[in-house]
């Protein structure tokens, strides 16, 4: 805890409000709310915390806060601040997904579509459906029952849907507005929960057709009834009042929360939403934040009723969402809440099993590696590999593994600038010097371990630059390969002795992943650079092709192979004159 934070903690008010945690770059990394700011913010810097909260606190260099007049104001402000800053530790609903609806378009000849975007266009929207498959299945059923127009633009002749009896072909025939209105009214009746009545009417028509010996028509109606049954049976009936409602329940353990949402549409449980995320506040506060975010998403449907557990503030949720919020004590609604809660507990249990397995592969492997090398746990590992072909286009690459996992946004590529010919030792010296000079200059975090994919000469070159030029003391180890170029061992120490590692240990598997990744990254960069240089050299002797047009061609075609397949017209599309294009094609044939 720095001096600035200590001073700010001493003057925090005992009022509700929001707080914004910031890192070294003054970036907001977490937004929270509190009933009493003084108690909440101080709690981060006192006492013990789980690993994820410790990581958050370790990055906090400053904070600010905003006082509000009530808890509900704090909640609303928190939601707005999360939207504004998108902090990396506020992870519960970052995907911002929108749910699909079935839409009847407002056109002379309306059509049915599945869409995720609700617009003020006088179209009629039904939903939401929690996944696109449920929406598409329902639309497919409606397409079979009601022959509305299918084509986006009207063709000049009938299509297959007309021959299947699923379209009235307004492209050819004059379909009255009254006919379209009747079809739309039937679809609306179906989507508003009237499918049982529609099924009854179809059954009566089927029996009537059979009595009149219209067996083909009776079979067609029977198939429609069966299709309604097969589609609607997938949606479990839960309530008898055909209302739309969402059921929320949550469970929490070991610093994690799971929220389950059951979507009830026209009295049916059609799907659920499962969200798992780390907790940084009290469970009730986390749940309120989740609900505020859940319904603040664009186009997210707010039903007429929401069911929530007894443990949350019903009045605050009603103020926040402006809809009916109930906390049922018994009956079918209470059973739904209990079922959602049970599902939340099960999902948490599964999450912990996966976390344990993942931690064994990542943090567990990091611990094993640290023990084997007799160093502090190498949470941050930076690995280097050189790549060239007989000294041509020499490059180097660095990959970063944080907590045993690739941290790709910090990968770096290096073109070798000061070395001529195939000199891996000098190349390694240059890259290590460039990398850690920049680290010192920009005050970036030093790694806990540096891995060199190379022999003793490259490892010693890296150590020499670090210790004798940059005065840095960072553990350096080398990745040893066998005759098949596979990870074999690790060497470290003054004499670079082999470090014994079990071949079936998580530490060994981690080294394999690191070695494969740094090799892949270096090779792909070398191929990219070699291809670009080959591209440039082919164009050097073509009159009319200067640096500007080289870049133009590279951007348009991307490779020599694609250029060789191109025609004069293709080159002209790329902005190359016809005469120059002809010269290019001749040059590419050589």
Curated annotation (Swiss-Prot):
Domain UVR: 196-231
Any one Gene Ontology molecular-function term assigned to this protein's record: DNA binding
Membrane-spanning parts: none
The UniProt record lists the keyword Cytoplasm: yes
InterPro entries linked: GIY-YIG_endonuc, GIY-YIG_endonuc_sf, GIY-YIG_UvrC_Cho, RuvA_2-like, UVR_dom, UVR_dom_sf, UvrABC_protein_C, UvrC
SMART domains reported in the protein's UniProt record: GIYc (SM00465)
One BP term from GO: SOS response
UniProt entry tagged with the keyword DNA repair: yes
Compartment list: Cytoplasm
Assigned keywords, A-Z: Cytoplasm, DNA damage, DNA excision, DNA repair, Excision nuclease, SOS response
SUPFAM superfamilies with a match to the protein in the record: C-terminal UvrC-binding domain of UvrB, GIY-YIG endonuclease, RuvA domain 2-like
GO cellular component: cytoplasm; excinuclease repair complex
Matches recorded under CDD domains: GIY-YIG_UvrC_Cho
Domain GIY-YIG: 14-91
Subunit (UniProt): Interacts with UvrB in an incision complex.
The family this protein is said to belong to: Belongs to the UvrC family.
The protein's role, per its UniProt record: The UvrABC repair system catalyzes the recognition and processing of DNA lesions. UvrC both incises the 5' and 3' sides of the lesion. The N-terminal half is responsible for the 3' incision and the C-terminal half is responsible for the 5' incision.
HAMAP family listed in its UniProt record: UvrC
Protein's UniProt name: UvrABC system protein C
Species per Swiss-Prot/TrEMBL record: Bacillus pumilus (strain SAFR-032)
Phylogenetic lineage: Bacteria, Bacillati, Bacillota, Bacilli, Bacillales
Gene name linked to the record: uvrC
